[in-house]
């Protein structure tokens, strides 16, 4: 039995996907992809699935995702799904299509939130100075 493991990251969210032969079921933390809320996050996760519909029809995917927020997790999941299906099929044309559509389907976005420093409300903003 063929098994492929893949992962994706976005900020502090990490998704790990396991691909096995099956009937096309995709579960995110044991929840079917079709009923994930909010809808915007679901649509974002569906992008690699829609682009490679016939490849996903014979594969069951279990994704465990932790850390981060809702959209960060959605980005991590879509990266894990895209990388995994490419490893499963080995299709160069699909890789080209993913890269042309959105490079972050294949490459994790390593940008992180800048740390807040003292003397202000955020990473760069400073408290207002008064001279009188």
Swiss-Prot record:
InterPro entries: Ribosomal_Su5_D2-typ_SF (IPR020568), Ribosomal_uS9 (IPR000754), Ribosomal_uS9_archaeal (IPR019958), Ribosomal_uS9_CS (IPR020574), Ribsml_uS5_D2-typ_fold_subgr (IPR014721)
PROSITE patterns: RIBOSOMAL_S9 (PS00360)
A Gene Ontology biological process term: maturation of SSU-rRNA from tricistronic rRNA transcript (SSU-rRNA, 5.8S rRNA, LSU-rRNA)
Keywords: Ribonucleoprotein, Ribosomal protein
Keyword Lipoprotein: no
Any one GO molecular-function label of the UniProt entry: RNA binding
Superkingdom, taxonomy of origin: Archaea
Gene3D superfamilies: 3.30.230.10
Pfam families per the UniProt record, alphabetical: Ribosomal_S9
GO cellular component, one term: cytosolic small ribosomal subunit
The keyword Ribosomal protein belongs to this UniProt entry's keyword annotation: yes
Family recorded in the similarity comment: Belongs to the universal ribosomal protein uS9 family.
Protein name in the entry: Small ribosomal subunit protein uS9
Organism: Methanothrix thermoacetophila (strain DSM 6194 / JCM 14653 / NBRC 101360 / PT) (Methanosaeta thermophila)
């Amino acid at each position: 039995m063929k098994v492929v493991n893949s992962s994706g990251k976005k900020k502090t969210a990490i998704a790990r996907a396991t691909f096995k032969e099956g009937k096309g079921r995709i579960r995110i933390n044991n929840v079917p992809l079709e009923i994930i809320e909010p809808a915007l996050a679901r649509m974002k996760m569906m992008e690699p699935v829609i682009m490679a519909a016939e490849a996903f029809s014979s594969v069951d995917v279990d994704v465990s995702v932790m850390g981060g927020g809702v959209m960060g997790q959605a980005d991590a999941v879509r990266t894990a799904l895209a990388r995994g299906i490419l490893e499963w099929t080995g299709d160069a044309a699909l890789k080209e299509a993913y890269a042309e559509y959105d490079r972050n389907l294949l490459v994790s976005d390593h940008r992180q939130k800048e740390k807040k420093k003292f003397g202000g409300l955020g990473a760069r903003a400073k408290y207002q100075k008064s001279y009188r």
